[in-house]
Curated annotation (Swiss-Prot):
GO terms for cellular component: Golgi apparatus; Golgi membrane. The gene is MNN2. Interacts with SVP26. It is a single-pass type II membrane protein. This is Alpha-1,2-mannosyltransferase MNN2. It comes from Saccharomyces cerevisiae (strain ATCC 204508 / S288c).
């Protein structure tokens, strides 16, 4: 079929060339003397080239062409881009499954709480088997049939598309703004510049939050940053047909951003290492997709693989959670009985552990198909795919959509092995986590290569597969601690923190001032108390410096605060009073915080 299509297009191209050559011979006699033959030949070459481009095709939705970039006021190029994504969204409208899951769970479901990847949860791993996971979210045969058809139709439809030439170029960072998230995005940008990162930043302003003129036109350009909009890639009439919300904006930021190499960040996620060279580092260069882990094991419904048409070999174990290096015979008593083995350890499945998508690195040339399928999962996430992927697990949302899409296409990716860290504070009620700590993927990959070499030497060489036996002394925890996790900052296998995902509370001065959240026994308290973990970067102090300077001293207008406070001088005084008091407290306690006191 593909050969026939190509022959047809070649025939059309040859035919049009013959016609144009004929026109050239005829019109050459009558051409204006001011038009040279060279100029006419150049025009002919351009026309033939444009026709060739128009009818060039690929069965791979992720194919990319090498042509002139289409952004930066290239009106014709932008129209091509809008046409491409208009087709994508038309397919989304036609192919999305109808209705929604009732989110009813079978009484036999054993998922009564989140299952982590620490030793105290190992006793619960049988609950993650295909047999047990299939007893949770209830999906009827008709629903499965409908989901299967819609998934197949969408995949087939986007496979017919060829992205416009130069759709994405360069490298940079994107996040989602709008409302309070624009203010938080600005805090991220200031952190990036504090760290010496010079990569450009794009902030997606959702359709309902447009109008941040001062922020977009005056503040951001000073920091090599700018606002982008859904209307950059979609016609207005298409936008009006969709209701976007929540996690779906991240998928939109991914495709709307102009960068080929993209770091997609949540607006409350602060990079605390220089990032300018991250796109030149392994494993990003070879895979084009790097993700980070969550705290929890994967709980994807087995029926997802049926819906997506993914073959799962239930007789072949290929890993033990994050350990995909040690031979399965070492940690599996009976390779012929995998009935209690976690589903995600089987060949063909999405690997453990679950994904935390507060940061994502993606090459959109290599992984355009991943981006487009994850868009489908996110558009249909609240109705179907979020519960199918997570089944009541914490953080249900877009987090599994990117890795699932890459896994579907068999595209390469790397998920960081180092466990997610936690930062927070203690009070009379116990420990309160305020941030997730995600680690340096380059260092992590170096530890992974060390693990491959060490384990390869132990089990490789002259040993046959039959000679490798079950080892009762094997431990996933030992594997993890030996090669990746070590709280000793000076240990050879220590991996630096790269991102502080400050998920609760967020650095929103209005909410913080209203709740008086960061107090203990009526006194101000620090929420980040282990600064050595983060190379002594005092994130609270630095962010409140920015808030004080831009909100209270310079009075830069942020639409979120302007809409909330308006002309109410009393409210402005209260909010800025909180900011200045908090800043004074953080400055006075900085040295003690660095010392760990």
């Amino acid at each position: 079929m593909l050969l026939t299509k190509r022959f047809s297009k070649l025939f059309k191209l040859t035919f049009i060339v013959l016609i144009l050559c004929g026109l050239f011979v005829i019109t050459n006699k009558y051409m204006d003397e001011n038009t040279s033959v060279k100029e006419y030949k150049e025009y002919l070459d351009r026309y033939v080239q444009s026709y060739s481009n128009k009818y060039s095709s690929s069965s791979d939705a992720a194919s990319a062409d090498d042509s002139t970039p289409l952004r930066d006021n290239d009106e014709a190029g932008n129209e091509k881009l809008k046409s491409f994504y208009n087709n994508v969204f038309n397919f989304l409208m036609v192919d999305s499954p109808k209705g929604s899951t009732a989110k009813q769970y079978n009484e036999a479901c054993l998922l009564k709480g989140d299952i982590g990847d620490r030793p105290d949860h190992y006793k619960d791993l049988y609950k993650l088997s295909a047999k047990e996971l299939s007893k949770c979210l209830e999906l009827s045969p008709d629903e499965v049939a409908s989901l299967t058809k819609s998934h197949k139709d969408y995949v087939e439809h986007i496979a017919t598309l060829v992205s416009p030439k130069g759709t994405y170029k360069g490298s940079g960072i994107a996040t989602v703004g709008g409302g309070k998230f624009s203010l938080m995005a600005f805090l991220i940008i200031k952190t990036l510049r504090n760290m010496g990162t010079t990569l450009p930043v794009e902030v997606l302003i959702p359709p309902g939050d447009e109008g941040e003129t001062e922020f977009c036109n005056k503040i951001l350009p000073k920091y090599n940053s700018k606002c982008i909009y859904v209307s950059d890639i979609l016609p207005r009439e298409t936008i009006e047909k969709f209701v976007f919300k929540g996690y779906q904006f991240k998928s939109l930021a991914l495709i709307a951003s102009s960068f080929e190499n993209l770091l997609l960040l949540d607006a409350d996620n602060f990079p605390i290492k220089p990032l300018d060279n991250i796109f030149n580092e392994e494993p990003y260069v070879s895979t084009g997709l790097v993700m980070w882990p969550d705290f929890w094991r994967r709980t994807t419904h087995p029926l997802y693989y049926d819906i997506a048409g993914i073959a799962v070999d239930k007789k072949k174990r290929v890993r033990n959670s994050r350990d995909d290096i040690t031979p399965p015979a070492v940690y599996t008593k009976d390779l012929k009985d995998l009935s209690d083995v976690p589903l995600s350890d089987l060949d063909g499945t999405i690997p453990d552990v679950s994904t935390e998508s507060g940061q994502l690195m993606i090459n959109k040339t290599k992984h355009l198909a991943t981006a487009l399928l994850s868009l489908f999962y996110n558009v249909n996430g609240p109705t179907w795919y979020y519960p199918i992927f997570s089944q009541k697990a914490a953080g249900e949302g877009d987090k599994e959509t990117f890795i699932a899409a890459a896994n579907f296409y068999g595209l390469s990716f790397y998920q960081v092995r180092t466990r997610t860290g936690v930062e927070g504070y203690h009070d009379e009620d116990g420990f309160h986590g305020v941030a997730m700590l995600q680690h340096d993927f380059v260092q992590d990959y170096g530890r992974y290569l060390n693990a491959m070499e060490s384990i390869g030497n132990k089990y490789g060489g002259t040993k046959s597969a039959d000679a490798i036996k079950f080892d009762k002394n094997y431990s996933l925890e030992k594997y993890t601690e030996e090669f990746f996790d070590n709280e000793d900052l000076n240990a050879k296998n220590h991996v630096d923190v790269m991102f502080i995902h400050s998920n609760f509370p967020k650095f929103d001065p209005y909410d913080l001032s209203k709740s008086n959240f960061l107090t203990t026994n009526g006194k101000p308290a620090r929420s980040y108390t282990a600064l050595k973990k983060v190379k002594n970067y005092d994130i609270e102090l630095e962010n409140f410096k920015v808030l004080n300077e831009y909100v209270c001293v310079n009075k830069n207008p942020f639409k979120y605060l302007d809409d909330l406070l308006g002309q109410d001088k009393t409210e402005w005084k209260r909010v800025c009073g909180y900011i200045t008091d908090r800043l004074a407290f953080l400055e006075s306690t900085h040295d003690k915080a660095i010392a760990g006191k």
